[in-house]
Amino acid sequence: MMLDPARSYDLIGDVHGCAHTLEHLLDRLGYQKQGGTWRHPTRMAVFLGDIIDRGPRIREALHIVHDMAEAGQALCIMGNHEFNALGWTTPAPPGSGKQFVREHNPRHARLIHETLTQFEHHPADWHDFLGWFYDMPLFVDAGRFRVVHACWDDGFIAPLRATFPDGCIDQHFLQAAAVPGSFACNAFDRLLRGTDMRLPDGLTLTGGDGLTRSFFRTKFWEDDPKTYGDIVFQPDALPEPVARTPLSSTEKNSLLRYGVDEPLLFVGHYWRSGKPAPIRPNLACLDYSAVLYGKLVAYRLDQETQLDPRKFVWVDVERPEVIS
């Protein structure tokens, strides 16, 4: 689906199975449920991916978003969790050394566990949703604004657009991602997971999610960073000595920079906290950790060319996740 740049949109961050909270947010945004589908007379919702995994009502959340998309009331782009689900269920190509595009190891199993459990008695539904995931574009460029789950990188988006003008990939491209270092693998990693940098001196960091990593997520918009601490962009802080470590010239040159003069860009993915606000006048992250009892956040986009802090709308996720 092409987005009409003259229309008004509500961009919505990572849902992760928080269906009741999503309904609460849609209600707050002025959408009404008509004929079983949430609708707005003049606006359209744009979801930034990661509808599935982790939360208590994954199937319900998918039905809400899918029904809106089918009715022309919403567009949903692909998040890394939808990509993971396709990879989990898709055989790897011969010669790749893998059984599935996404290997069935304990770490990957843990991430998709809630989704598979909640669909255990609804296999036809799961099959249909997996097919729908292929209709989710990896990116959307509406001219005056752009959406991608984690990171806008023209170095990947330009060749992708040449092959997939609507941003929607096919199974062949998904299977190509089974090969580490391939264009497909790197494109998914960059657009759906963002940029990262290896920790120095062989260090590892165990995050709040319990996973141990040898790298950290980085900003892709800093103009003149000096230290690791200037570029870290994740919930888990770097140890102070690491944060103070100067960036080498090679590391600085490797950083991606989304320019301040580029179109408005909306991303999810990054588990932010606090009061929703722009990162820069042309950049907003709308993932505020809803599934960790944070906020489910939207931005109400009209015709502005710079982001307005007053146009963030959100619902605090209550314990347990309820609608009122």
Where are these regions (language model features)?
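A short acidic-Thr-Gly-centered motif at the start of a beta-strand
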Residues: 1-5, 37-38, 63-70, 137-141, ...
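Divalent metal-coordination and catalytic microenvironments
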Residues: 14, 50, 79-80, 133, ...
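Acidic, His/Gly-rich catalytic cores of divalent-metal-dependent hydrolytic chemistry
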Residues: 166-324
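Active-site-proximal beta-strand elements of phosphoester/diester hydrolases
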Residues: 8-16, 145-151, 284-286
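Active-site environment of divalent metal-dependent phosphoester hydrolases
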Residues: 18-19, 53-55, 82-86, 154-155, ...
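N-terminal active-site segment of His-dependent metallophosphoesterases
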Residues: 1-64
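Residue-level marker for buried hydrophobic side chains located in beta-strands
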Residues: 11, 45-47, 76-77, 146, ...
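Active-site neighborhood of divalent metal-dependent phosphoester bond hydrolases
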Residues: 55-62, 67-197
